[in-house]
Every structure is written in structure tokens, then in C-alpha cells.
């Protein structure tokens, strides 16, 4: 590309850089106002520049709608409203067509009054077309995630593959230095989402260290993202004069990613409670602050209803290289578990798993596998020989929660079934996907 050298191009470049800087800081309204003011004050501008300014104003509006996730619909007064007319796909398609016009106009303006400017705008618009296409695909991806919230089990590994394919497709497609704020923001968002989905899958696979690494990476990148909002100030003008400033409210997408990370952290802290409890007291304090605090909820339930034990059982039969709690060297070898050891209690409260009850627990899991595999039923079993009652449910494949009482309890007792249903639903992760929709009470 011929480097733009004229004073005019420099002036236009300044407008563009300020616009993309605002957009990179998620200041959509400032970005939109900036180009609209330029358009209003420069009505004699050439065709390409006028088209570009109009397209950029629409880009700012589209990005605001995208980050607000309003295209998923919004609950208002109990009713679900979908703004089909203003759907993100319609907005982006219209914007794509506008940018294509700038590309064509710029290429046809050979020998015009500002060839360097025409070439720059054509080049930027071409790359922005890829940016728009990438966001259309990511918006579709979020819609897919939201749709999956109604499923009993979500295969996060499949989602990671789809997301990585999108990232690979558009990698380095909008690399112009002027667009670097957009490229950085896109990369940050997709990286955070990929880390979280990988962590979700790795927790399900019961892989401690890789899950921890992905959660940590997501946390670090969300902190970087959050600092952008902390630096943004919104000025509010008061009715009777005067004004005040407050930190800008992050968009729904960022808040949702934070929520998703916190839910995964809570699940991680529960599934790997044994390994984490061996850490420093500071680590214990940090994991106790998770929301929900599964350890705290279960401990309260045990005290209130005098349960002997609540365990999370991991069926290791389909797992490769199961090695037990904590860190393990990648090349270390451990013989595969056999017999009852194929069903370890990866979490057991208030103390170690009650070994005398384990044959019964495994028998119930085997006999009632069809009910448990529905991932929604609570199974009840009373053994009069040992005067003990067992309640079991399965939040996701390979994991079963069992509550043991050394007394007779009715299967109609809603205290126990409600507790297990709530615990199971919370661990599934489908609630996190459902809360992608703005206004969701999930």
C-alpha cells in the first residue's frame, strides 16, 4: 500500500484513530458522536469519506448492540421480546454492504483528488468487512450457547472446537495498525471465552492442573479487560445544574463472562476440594468465598438433617490416566483403579467416604443407571438390613451425588429431593448459558 502522506489524509487518519480508540475502549456513544460530528462539519467531503463516516456510525451502534447481547432477546415484565427487526445479523449484513461500497468507491476513484485517502479507506473497509463477518459468526455462537441452556448436558469440548475454527478463520484478517484496538478487543473476548469453555470441559474430565491454568488465564484477561472500564468515566448532568462522574458500567457480555468464570470457579473449588484443602489457609478462605459455596451448602445440609455423608462420586471407567487428587507429573504412571476403587468419592463430607456403605452405593448406581442417566431424576433406596437410606442423582455423566442417612427417610421428603435437584442443576452449568440473555433471573 502507498503510504498516505498528504495533510488531508493525516487529518482523516486522526479522525479514524480517535474513533477506533473509543471503540476499543467500548465507548460506543463517544465513537458514534465523533464520526457524526465530523460528517456534519465536513459536508463537502468526497464520496468515500462520507460513506465511511456513515458506516463507522453504524459500526459503533452494532458493537453496542453486540456487547449488550440484546439480540438474544430481553425479558420485560415477564414477557420475552425479540427485536427481530433490529437483530444483530440484519445490522451487520447492512453494515457489511456499506463497507463493500467504500471498497468499490475507493478502487474506482483512480486519479481523484486524494488517491492516498481513497486507497486507505478502501483498505480499511476491506478489513472491517472481515471484522463484521467474524462478529456475525461469534453472535451466532452465543445464540447456539443460549439454545444449549435447555439441554441436560452441554459438551463444552465441541463448543471449543467451533470457537477455535472461527478464530483461525479470521486470525490476522483485520491487522491494520489503525484497527489494532478492534483486533485486541476481539482477541481478548474470544480468548477469555475459549479459556472458560476449556475449563468447563476439563473440570468435567476431572483434570485439576489444566482446568486451573485455563481459569487463571481467563481471570487474568478479564482483569485486563476490566481495567479498561475502570478508566472510563461517564459524566451525568443534573436537572438543576452541575454534573457528576461515575465509572462506566461494563456491557452485559463482560458481566456475563465474569459470572461464568465465577460459577466455574465455584464448581472447580467443589470438584477439587480435596486437593485445594491441602493448600494454604489463604486458599481455603478464597474458595469459601465462591458463589455458590457448595462446600458450605452441603455442610449446612448435613448438620440440619443429620446426614451421615454426602459424596460426589466419579466413575473412572471411561477416564484415561485417572491419577487421583492434586498435581501429577504428565509422565507419571499409576495403575488403573479396580473394583470399588473405580468409583472414588472425589468429594466426601463431613469426613472420608463411609466404606461400609460403598458396596450398596455402587449396587444402586448399577441397578438404577437408567434413571440416573436421565440427568434429572433423584433415586431413593432404603436398605432395612443396615437401616440406611440413600438418595442419588447425577448432575452430569460420570458424576453422581449420594446422600446417606443411617435411618429411614421417605422418598417423598421434599427437603432431600429439592436439595439434590438444586445442587445438580447448579453444577450442570446450563444456568450460566441461560443467563446470556439480558434480564435473565437465572
Curated annotation (Swiss-Prot):
**Compartments it resides in:** Lysosome membrane
Q: Name one GO biological process term.
A: cellular response to glucose starvation
Sorted alphabetically, which InterPro entries does this protein's record hold?
Answer: C12orf66-like_central_sf, KICS_2
Q: Which Pfam families match?
A: C12orf66_like (PF09404)
Disulfide partners: none
Q: Which UniProt keywords apply?
A: Lysosome, Membrane
The family line of this record is: Belongs to the KICS2 family.
What is said about its interaction partners and assembly?
May be part of the KICSTOR complex.
Output this protein's name: KICSTOR subunit 2
Amino acid at each position: 500500500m502507498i503510504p498516505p502522506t498528504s495533510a488531508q489524509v493525516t487529518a482523516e487518519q486522526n479522525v479514524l484513530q480517535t474513533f477506533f480508540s473509543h471503540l476499543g475502549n467500548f465507548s460506543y456513544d463517544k465513537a458514534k458522536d465523533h464520526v457524526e460530528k465530523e460528517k456534519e462539519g465536513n459536508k463537502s467531503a468526497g464520496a468515500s469519506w462520507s460513506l465511511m463516516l456513515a458506516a463507522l456510525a453504524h459500526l459503533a451502534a452494532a458493537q453496542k448492540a453486540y456487547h449488550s447481547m440484546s439480540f438474544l432477546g430481553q425479558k420485560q415484565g415477564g414477557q420475552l421480546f425479540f427485536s427481530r427487526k433490529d437483530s444483530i445479523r440484519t445490522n451487520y449484513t447492512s453494515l457489511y454492504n456499506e463497507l463493500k461500497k467504500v471498497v468499490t468507491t475507493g478502487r474506482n476513484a483512480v486519479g481523484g483528488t486524494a488517491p492516498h485517502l481513497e486507497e486507505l479507506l478502501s483498505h480499511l473497509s476491506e478489513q472491517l468487512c472481515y471484522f463484521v463477518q467474524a462478529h456475525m459468526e461469534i453472535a451466532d455462537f452465543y445464540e447456539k450457547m443460549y439454545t444449549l441452556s435447555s439441554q441436560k448436558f452441554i459438551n463444552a469440548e465441541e463448543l471449543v472446537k467451533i470457537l477455535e475454527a472461527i478464530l483461525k478463520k479470521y486470525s490476522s484478517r483485520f491487522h491494520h495498525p489503525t484497527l489494532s484496538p478492534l483486533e485486541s478487543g476481539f482477541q481478548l473476548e474470544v480468548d477469555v471465552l475459549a479459556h472458560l469453555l476449556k475449563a468447563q470441559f476439563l473440570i468435567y474430565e476431572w483434570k485439576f492442573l489444566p482446568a486451573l491454568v485455563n481459569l487463571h488465564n481467563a481471570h487474568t484477561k478479564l482483569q485486563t479487560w476490566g481495567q479498561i472500564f475502570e478508566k472510563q468515566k461517564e459524566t451525568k448532568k443534573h436537572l438543576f445544574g452541575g454534573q457528576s462522574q461515575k465509572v462506566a458500567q461494563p456491557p452485559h457480555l463482560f458481566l456475563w463472562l465474569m459470572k461464568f468464570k465465577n460459577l466455574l470457579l465455584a464448581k472447580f473449588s467443589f470438584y477439587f476440594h480435596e486437593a485445594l484443602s491441602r493448600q494454604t489457609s489463604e486458599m481455603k478462605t478464597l474458595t469459601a468465598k465462591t458463589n455458590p459455596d457448595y462446600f458450605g451448602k452441603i455442610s449446612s445440609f448435613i448438620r440440619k438433617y443429620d446426614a451421615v455423608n454426602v459424596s460426589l462420586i466419579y466413575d473412572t471407567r471411561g477416564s484415561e490416566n485417572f491419577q487421583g487428587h492434586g498435581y501429577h507429573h504428565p509422565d507419571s504412571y499409576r495403575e488403573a483403579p479396580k473394583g470399588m476403587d473405580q468409583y472414588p468419592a472425589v468429594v466426601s463430607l463431613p469426613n472420608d467416604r463411609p466404606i461400609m456403605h460403598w458396596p450398596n452405593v455402587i449396587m444402586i448406581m448399577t441397578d438404577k443407571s437408567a434413571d440416573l442417566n436421565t440427568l434429572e431424576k433423584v433415586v431413593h433406596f432404603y436398605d432395612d438390613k443396615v437401616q440406611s437410606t440413600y438418595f442419588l442423582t447425577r448432575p452430569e455423566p460420570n458424576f453422581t451425588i449420594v446422600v446417606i442417612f443411617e435411618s429411614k427417610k421417605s422418598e417423598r421428603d421434599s427437603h432431600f429431593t429439592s436439595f439434590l435437584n438444586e445442587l445438580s442443576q447448579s453444577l450442570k452449568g446450563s444456568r450460566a448459558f441461560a443467563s446470556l440473555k439480558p434480564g435473565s433471573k437465572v
